């Protein structure tokens, strides 16, 4: 977990509340995603860690973002720059996404498999996870050849390891004990 999570939470909450109030949640998530990517740029990272005045830093950051930020998004950047918190933007985005998922009663579910799964397999996993979690789910699929076969499903703190690799690791643990 990043060192900026605690710092990011109030900014994310304020942005989310504003976005809901103005019915622009998608737009705000897009703006935050873009701004978070800008902070990851090598040259921008140097500026963020430099000794620029907050106003100069904010205006430079806004200039780089261009049309991607509306007036309200620019105001958020100015406030964060004033408090020397622009490095927390990736965590603000993450917290914003969590707030959105909670408000929409959805959960992000990560599905890792050795090969791409069919639509039928994905819909079965989705239905099973919706039943288990009692909410809508959004599947994020990853391919990891080290899984060998089967799937690993992660939803929050819950992990369901149905992979061959997981079974082999459990078998090795049993044999060693």
From Swiss-Prot:
Keyword Cell inner membrane: yes
Major localization class: membrane
Keyword annotations of the record: ATP synthesis, Cell inner membrane, Cell membrane, CF(1), Hydrogen ion transport, Ion transport, Membrane, Transport
Keyword Cell membrane: yes
GO molecular function, one term: proton-transporting ATP synthase activity, rotational mechanism
Membrane topology reported for the UniProt record: Peripheral membrane protein
Pfam families: OSCP
Subcellular location: Cell inner membrane
A Gene Ontology term for the protein's cellular component: proton-transporting ATP synthase complex
NCBIfam families tied to this protein: ATP_synt_delta, PRK05758.2-2, PRK05758.2-5
UniProt cross-references to PANTHER family, sorted A to Z: ATP SYNTHASE DELTA CHAIN
Family: Belongs to the ATPase delta chain family.
Function: F(1)F(0) ATP synthase produces ATP from ADP in the presence of a proton or sodium gradient. F-type ATPases consist of two structural domains, F(1) containing the extramembraneous catalytic core and F(0) containing the membrane proton channel, linked together by a central stalk and a peripheral stalk. During catalysis, ATP synthesis in the catalytic domain of F(1) is coupled via a rotary mechanism of the central stalk subunits to proton translocation.
Subunit structure: F-type ATPases have 2 components, F(1) - the catalytic core - and F(0) - the membrane proton channel. F(1) has five subunits: alpha(3), beta(3), gamma(1), delta(1), epsilon(1). F(0) has three main subunits: a(1), b(2) and c(10-14). The alpha and beta chains form an alternating ring which encloses part of the gamma chain. F(1) is attached to F(0) by a central stalk formed by the gamma and epsilon chains, while a peripheral stalk is formed by the delta and b chains.
Name this protein carries in UniProt: ATP synthase subunit delta
Organism of derivation: Salmonella arizonae (strain ATCC BAA-731 / CDC346-86 / RSK2980)
